[in-house]
């Protein structure tokens, strides 16, 4: 039996101030005449219909009539925005039939493979919010144990086609992406102005933080607007040859954003899903030449070179299929890159490097130059092997800073608070010796406890890196926060630093 076999009851729409993430949720009173116990149960899927408009949602039943009255149907904020009908409108509600594409998910769980048609239908249902979070989880888990190359190609294709697809006039569109996991590491904000100042086109779309203290979009937002639309983005790129904007507002690969929202709580991060996530967005963005940064370290996403090699081959395979020139570089992921962790602190690092400040973090400068060099080598007019020298020339001369300011002016001024957290606590060394290890995962966690990225000025300022000599009581890093509770909780956490005696051999650190 499905929703078309039952009478459709018509409560009136009420807007409920509930943030339910990406999931459509509707709330009904237990005392509502529309609530038929033999038909509706809590957390069941229902179909809402008004005229020709249809939306699927998860049903919540409440005993609190102050939230929704007996004649009302409350729509959570995401559901209200998507349904886009005025408060007080009569709406029919009925049990929802399961999406037909779930049959393919069940078959995959039992060991079969997806066809390209299966994956296309699944992604279509995902992007039209026909799947609940539980059904999305089922799809992710069904794909986690194994995925064929054919399934991966079909997944990338379907995800790229589901959103905006950008087209550019230039024959060479360069881009870069890091798989993440390393605190700081805000190289894109230095690479983009260097490459754009040279003359190549680099329309960079970036993500916001999900489990980290800052994403590139969060950090760029300290300097300029990042929530620009497609047409405005094209205008900025036409004027500046580059941009640094939030990909979510441009709507590249919307299925990926939905999948990530369920992946992260489950701790799922398979190689295939990572490749599909990244390359679907780059394919939709119109990239022709792509540089992938794979940090390797004991607390990075990739812990050894073998893992990096397997992932590299997967990126190259999919890139070749779609005609994207993919270059993969393996980088040092043993410790943070730069001194700041958190949006404001990371933005300060970026601008210090671009301004050639003598106090700027040398590791962030050097890594950015090396990555920019790889991208500049894609210019057929540039002599082979001269990419690094050209990148350094553009940075040292101030051309990159000038280009960054041009991009900032084109995107517009920031719209959020850019103050640094004024409550601080210094974490100090417990003994004399040398820093032999830094736990990236732990530092990310401490920065989030301090308030980042919600509080833009919260985070951590590092004073010591691997190989540095320290004395007992000397500050290793400083916690910044706006709330006393965040500062104190972060200060009470594990130090994240390993300190060995002078006699220890630092080469033992992977």
UniProtKB/Swiss-Prot annotation:
Sorted alphabetically, the Gene Ontology BP terms of this entry are: pyrimidine nucleobase metabolic process; pyrimidine nucleoside metabolic process
Do you know which Gene3D superfamilies this protein is assigned to?
Answer: 1.20.970.50, Nucleoside phosphorylase/phosphoribosyltransferase catalytic domain (3.40.1030.10), Pyrimidine nucleoside phosphorylase-like, C-terminal domain (3.90.1170.30)
Known catalytic reactions: thymidine + phosphate = 2-deoxy-alpha-D-ribose 1-phosphate + thymine
Q: Where is the signal peptide?
A: none
Q: What class of enzyme is it?
A: transferase
Q: InterPro entries of this UniProt entry?
A: Glycosyl_Trfase_fam3 (IPR000312), Glycosyl_Trfase_fam3_N_dom (IPR017459), Glycosyl_Trfase_fam3_N_dom_sf (IPR036320), Nuc_phospho_transferase (IPR035902), PYNP-like_C_sf (IPR036566), PYNP_C (IPR013102), Pyrmidine_PPase_CS (IPR017872), Thym_Pase_Put (IPR028579)
Q: The organism sits in which domain of life?
A: Bacteria
- Mind listing the UniProt keywords for this protein, alphabetically? Glycosyltransferase, Transferase
Mention any one GO cellular component term assigned to this protein in its UniProt record: cytosol
Keyword Transferase part of the UniProt annotation: yes
Keyword Transport carried by entry: no
| Pfam families (UniProt xref) | Glycos_trans_3N (PF02885), Glycos_transf_3 (PF00591), PYNP_C (PF07831)
Question: GO molecular function: any one?
Answer: thymidine phosphorylase activity
The EC number(s) this enzyme carries: 2.4.2.4
Q: Which SUPFAM superfamilies match?
A: Nucleoside phosphorylase/phosphoribosyltransferase catalytic domain, Nucleoside phosphorylase/phosphoribosyltransferase N-terminal domain, Pyrimidine nucleoside phosphorylase C-terminal domain
Which family does the similarity line name? Belongs to the thymidine/pyrimidine-nucleoside phosphorylase family. Type 2 subfamily.
Q: Which NCBIfam families match?
A: ARCH_P_rylase, PRK04350.1
UniProt name for this protein: Putative thymidine phosphorylase
Organism of derivation: Nitrobacter hamburgensis (strain DSM 10229 / NCIMB 13809 / X14)
């Amino acid at each position: 039996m499905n929703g078309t076999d039952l009478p459709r009851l018509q409560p009136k729409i009420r807007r409920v101030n509930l943030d339910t993430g990406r999931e459509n949720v509707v709330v009904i009173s237990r005392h509502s005449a529309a609530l038929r116990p033999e038909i509706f149960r809590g957390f069941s899927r229902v179909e809402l219909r008004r005229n020709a408009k249809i939306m699927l949602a998860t049903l919540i039943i409440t005993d609190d009539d102050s939230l929704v009255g007996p004649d009302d149907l409350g729509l959570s904020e995401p559901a209200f925005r998507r349904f886009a009908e005025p408060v007080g409108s009569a709406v029919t509600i009925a049990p929802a039939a399961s999406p037909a594409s779930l049959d393919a998910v069940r078959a995959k769980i039992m060991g079969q493979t997806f066809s390209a048609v299966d994956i296309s239908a699944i992604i279509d249902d995902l992007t039209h919010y026909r799947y609940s979070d539980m059904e999305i989880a089922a799809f992710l888990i069904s794909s986690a144990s194994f995925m064929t190359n054919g399934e991966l190609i079909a997944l990338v294709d379907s995800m790229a086609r589901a959103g905006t697809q950008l087209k550019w006039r230039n024959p060479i569109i360069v881009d870069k992406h890091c798989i993440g996991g390393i605190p700081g590491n805000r190289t894109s904000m230095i690479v983009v102005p260097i490459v754009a100042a040279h003359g190549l086109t680099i329309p960079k779309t970036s993500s916001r933080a999900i489990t980290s203290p800052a994403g590139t979009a969060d950090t760029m937002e300290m300097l300029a607007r990042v929530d620009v639309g497609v047409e405005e983005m094209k205008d900025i790129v036409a004027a500046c040859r580059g941009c640094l904007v939030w990909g979510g507002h441009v709507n590249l690969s919307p299925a990926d954003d939905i999948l990530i929202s369920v992946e992260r709580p489950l701790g799922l991060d398979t190689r295939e899903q990572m490749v599909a996530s990244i390359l679907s967005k780059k394919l939709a963005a119109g990239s022709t030449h792509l540089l992938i940064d794979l940090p390797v370290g004991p607390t990075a996403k990739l812990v050894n070179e073998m893992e990096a090699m397997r992932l590299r081959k997967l990126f190259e395979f999919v890139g070749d299929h779609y005609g994207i020139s993919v270059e993969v570089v393996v980088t040092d992921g043993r410790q943070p890159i730069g001194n700041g962790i958190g949006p404001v602190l990371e933005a300060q690092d970026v601008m210090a490097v671009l301004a050639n400040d003598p106090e700027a973090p040398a590791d962030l400068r050097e890594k950015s130059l090396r990555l920019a060099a790889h991208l500049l080598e894609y210019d057929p007019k540039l002599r082979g092997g001269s990419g690094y020298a050209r990148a350094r020339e553009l940075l040292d001369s101030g051309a990159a800073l000038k280009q960054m300011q041009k991009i900032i002016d084109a995107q517009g001024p920031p719209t959020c608070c850019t103050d640094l957290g004024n409550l601080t606590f210094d974490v100090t060394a417990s003994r004399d010796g040398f820093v032999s290890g830094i736990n990236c995962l732990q530092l990310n966690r401490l920065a989030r406890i301090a308030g980042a990225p919600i509080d833009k000025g919260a985070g951590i300022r590092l004073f010591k890196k691997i190989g540095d000599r320290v004395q007992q009581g000397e500050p290793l890093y400083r916690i910044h926060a706006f709330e006393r509770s965040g500062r104190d909780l972060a200060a009470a956490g594990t130090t994240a630093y390993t300190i060995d005696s002078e006699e220890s051999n630092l080469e033992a650190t992977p």
